[in-house]
Curated annotation (Swiss-Prot):
This is Undecaprenyl-diphosphatase 3. The chain crosses the membrane at residues 15-37, 42-62, 83-103, 106-126, 142-162, 183-203, 216-236, 242-262. The keyword Secreted does not apply. Its EC number is 3.6.1.27. Its main location: membrane.
Length: 263
């Protein structure tokens, strides 16, 4: 298959699934297997196109991101600030640094991914069932305690297949944060976390990068960026109506497909 076509297919899958609670890792592994793109080059490619998805968040939430560093203000009252982000980053950041190699060795495999797809779906159903009325209906109403709780749930995203947005939005619901506010906080929180993780992976895989792959990487990056932009905007509109439950059932179906096609 031509590199440009691989770039478009994989970039579209990455952009569509990175910020939906369905596990981008599971979809990328399955798609790569189906089109025969699952070698060492594919692993570096996934890191590069993930940066395209991150750029989409930066473009959509640029006013928020500027306000976090003291440039501009989105509201006259109390608002989300940099400390909210730092607090949310600490749990997964510490865990990721301490156990990065162990996580890569133990959890990056077909079996663990299938288990996490199911476990993540169960968590989402439980969160919907037992969540109480929201005390933080908007992003600016999130407390430091709620930010830390969401950060704790983000640790689950270190397990491939669990889904960053699925785990953090579920944590937000259990901490009495509304669906939309939890999702927006999740996306903003993902920027520093994903940049750090992707940067680390790129450094470790630097010797695999080649100028011969520029077309592949560029096509995938641009496709992931465009599709992620559309996916994020659509998901935020959809979330207020359909909640997490349909995504949970989809994860169960994906786990079955993954089991029969990959394992």
């Amino acid at each position: 298959m031509a590199d440009w076509l691989i770039g478009i297919i994989m970039g579209a899958v990455e952009g569509l699934t990175e910020f939906l609670p369905v596990s981008s890792t599971g979809h990328m592994i399955l798609t790569g297997h189906l089109i025969g793109f699952d070698d060492d080059r594919a692993k570096v490619f996934e890191v590069v196109i993930q940066l395209g998805s991150i750029l989409a968040v930066v473009v959509i939430f640029w006013k928020r991101l500027w306000s976090l560093v003291g440039i501009g203000k989105v509201t006259d009252g109390p608002s989300l600030n940099l400390l909210h982000i730092i607090i949310g980053m600490i749990p997964a950041g510490v865990l990721g640094v301490l156990f990065h190699s162990a996580i890569k060795e133990v959890l990056f495999g077909p079996g663990p991914v299938v288990i996490s797809l199911v476990a993540g779906g169960i968590l989402m159903i439980v969160a919907e069932k037992f969540s109480k009325p929201s005390t933080a209906r908007t992003l600016d109403e999130i407390t430091y305690k709620q930010a830390f709780t969401i950060g704790m749930f983000q640790c689950l995203a270190l397990w491939p297949g669990f889904s960053r947005s699925g785990s953090t939005i579920s944590g937000g619901l259990l901490a009495r944060v509304s669906h939309t506010a939890a999702a927006e906080y999740t996306f903003i929180l993902a920027v520093p976390m994903m940049v750090a993780a992707s940067g680390l992976d790129l450094i470790k895989s630097w010797d695999i990068l080649s100028t011969a792959d520029i077309q592949l990487f560029a096509t995938g990056f641009i496709t992931a960026f465009v599709v992620a932009m559309l996916a994020i905007v659509s998901f935020l509109k959809l979330l207020s109506r359909v909640k997490l439950t349909p995504f949970a059932y989809y994860r169960f179906i994906l786990a079955a497909v993954f089991y029969f096609f990959i394992m």
